[in-house]
Amino acid sequence: SVVGSAAAWITQALPFSPEQGTVVFWLVNLGFVVVLWAVVAVLTVRMAGRRWTDGLMVAVAPGIVLAGTINWDLWAVALLACGMYAWSRGRSLTAGVLFGLGAAMKLYPLLILGPLLILAVRSRRWRPFLLAAGGTVAAWAAVNVPLMVVNVQAWSVFFTFSGERGPGLSSVWHAWDVTAAQAGWAFVPEGSLTLLAYGTFAVCCLGIFVLGVRVRHTPRLAQLTFLVVAAFVLTNKVYSPQFVVWLIPLLALALPRWRDFWVWQTVEALHFFAVWMYLAKGVAETPPQHSMDDSVYVAAILAHMLAVLWLCGRVVWEMLHPAEDLVKRDHGGHPDTDPLAGAYAGPARGRSGQPAAVQA
């Protein structure tokens, strides 16, 4: 990656021996992670508005402590947070550019275009959405097209691998295969996995779209974005341990309830250790009685999935019952309030063009 190459260049420029290079490379990336973590925390505090303490969830999240250094995902998380902050200030094009840069790091920031489309449909104001979408595409292309031109084969490795890979760690599909191996059931057919995973995600997105458009009062951007990203991580071919980092800032803005946060983070921490114990079983030469049973690993996956589904259910409940939405309550109490709405602040508009905040 570009970031990895930059970290390698910095490592080589420092006065350390080749033997020390691996540790120095990790420390350089750790420095980036700490800065990015702080950026995301500060922006989340800013976006939380009157409920600024909700943003502290990002600062204390065990999920970031445990998984923040596994990959370069925090770059995408930070760019998405920057984009959402720009959007909340009415800078639609700038937000789109930041979303696109985030998507160049990790594709998941693209998912926010779905929630923005829902808000565009509800408000019947298309220009902000088109500006954001255009900025996203342009920024993503500005990063990727030169790399594609230089070496399209290397550039396409990620997409080829993603399309051809089988069930990955901690996905529902992998949990099924691990269970099937013990019970003698049929495995998930690899030739159909892509269709199953992305088809399930598409169905979830359709459900979120219908809910977002038809719900009586305008849902908040953070609520919709959390639902879409959660649907992706639950249905994807793999649930890498660092994917929890994607959800933490979104939850702080979508469902700022500390009890739910700590229960979820506890479950995710248990799942984190279960993943590494499962991997250790495959590479370490230890007796079976000293290894974690596969059923415990599957139970950890199911617990993680149920915890995320519980959070999704809570978000949907507050979308349907805005009087229980703490963010709306503390930002004036109007059922259509959203401090992150940006260009879509205010009630939705009906077919006549008049405000229709209670339109079904």
What function would you assign to each model-found segment?
Residues 1-155, 197-360:
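Multi-pass membrane glycosyltransferase architecture that uses lipid-linked
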Residues 147-178, 287-291:
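Extracytoplasmic catalytic-loop and juxtamembrane helix elements of membrane-embedded
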Residues 165, 169-195, 204-205, 221, ...:
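Generic multipass alpha-helical transmembrane bundles of integral membrane proteins
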